[in-house]
Regions:
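Short intrinsically disordered terminal tails
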Residues: 1, 285-286
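Structural signature of tandem-repeat unit edges
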Residues: 1-36, 46-58, 67-81, 92-105, ...
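Consensus positions within tandem repeat domains that build extended binding/scaffold surfaces
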Residues: 38-41, 60-63, 83-88, 107-110, ...
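Active-site catalytic pocket residues across diverse enzymes, especially alpha/beta-hydrolases
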Residues: 90, 114, 265
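Polar, enzyme-active/binding microenvironments
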Residues: 216, 267, 286
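Short, aromatic/basic amphipathic alpha-helical patches
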Residues: 236-241, 259-272
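Short, low-complexity, Pro/Ser/Thr/Gly-rich segments in the mature regions of secreted, periplasmic
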Residues: 279-285
């Protein structure tokens, strides 16, 4: 595609073209009919400055990996799925404040490292309907590390998120508080290295918390389990390398379950760090 701007009207032709089997040598790529960007479609298209695809709803894995875009125009409100590593390491010029109201599926590392990079600085992300559904391939079977190393990310809104993926916010060092009201499970290493995280509020549906999900959260003060009716399962290493284990942070639970938590399997190791939510309204907001 030697022209500086390529505009196509036959969407069937474009479905064939956008398969990473051609060279993009122009500076601008625009099409108003394409709805799906296939895997690696713009992979390492380093000469490309601008992509305009307003009809796209699905973004394939590694779609913008290795690009140097200065402008990416998508109708973000219509995006339904984003594949593995699509915007990894800041490629693709993602907006600083990103809302994806239609998004239902995310691939591993989709936005990993998309902060303080050459092309983007993702600051806030809102995922109103995402429940944790993933996009997988033969080599990556889950949505691990979706936002890992987004060091400028300060705010996350995912009110419908059920399963917090493994390593999903690892080393997001600008995060200070997080709320996941419907989370049922927390993956290993989900918040590892979030060194400014002081408070995390998990709703009453949580049933399990996996290994080291809060490790090296060096400013953590409170893990709040608001509304739980049973004691969630934890592993031997769930609170490894945390301020909870060192006696500097607390787990806040409903008063009616405080004593149950303190004698529960593995929780009993942290009995001195378990407090009743009702006794600390300034911290727990109740």
């Amino acid at each position: 595609m030697a022209n500086s701007i390529a505009t196509y009207t036959d969407s069937q032709i474009m479905k064939c073209l956008l398969t990473h089997d051609f060279d993009l040598i122009g500076k601008r790529f625009e099409d108003n009919l394409i709805t799906k960007i296939k895997t690696g479609a713009f992979f390492e298209a380093t000469n490309l400055d601008e992509v305009v695809l307003p009809a796209v709803t699905h973004i394939g894995s590694m779609a913008f990996a290795g690009t140097n875009l200065t402008t990416l125009t998508l109708t973000w409100a219509n995006i339904v799925s984003i594949g593995i590593g699509a915007f990894q390491d800041g490629f693709g010029k993602v907006p600083q404040n990103l809302t994806l109201p239609s998004l239902t599926a995310l691939g591993a590392g989709a936005f990993a490292g998309a902060s303080d990079a050459k092309n983007t600085e993702l600051r806030t992300i809102s995922l109103p309907i995402w429940t944790g559904s993933s996009i997988s391939d033969e080599s990556i079977s889950s949505n691990t590390g979706i936002f890992a190393y987004c060091s400028a990310l300060t705010s996350v809104s995912a009110p419908e998120l059920l399963a917090i993926p493994m390593s999903s916010f690892q080393y997001c060092t600008a995060l200070t508080e997080l709320v996941f009201p419907k989370a049922t499970s927390i993956g290993s290493g989900s918040f590892t290295g979030c060194t400014n995280l002081t408070k995390i509020d998990i709703g009453g549906a949580v049933t399990s918390m996996n290994s080291s999900f809060l490790s090296t959260t060096t400013k953590l003060e409170a893990l709040i389990l608001l509304g739980v009716t049973t004691v969630p399962n934890i592993g031997n290493s769930t609170f490894n390398d945390t301020r909870i284990a060192s006696g500097q942070a607390y787990v806040y639970v409903p008063k009616s379950l405080e004593d149950t938590f303190k004698v529960a399997n593995r929780w009993s190791n942290y009995a001195s760090q378990i407090r009743a939510i009702e006794d600390y309204p300034a911290i727990c907001g109740s």
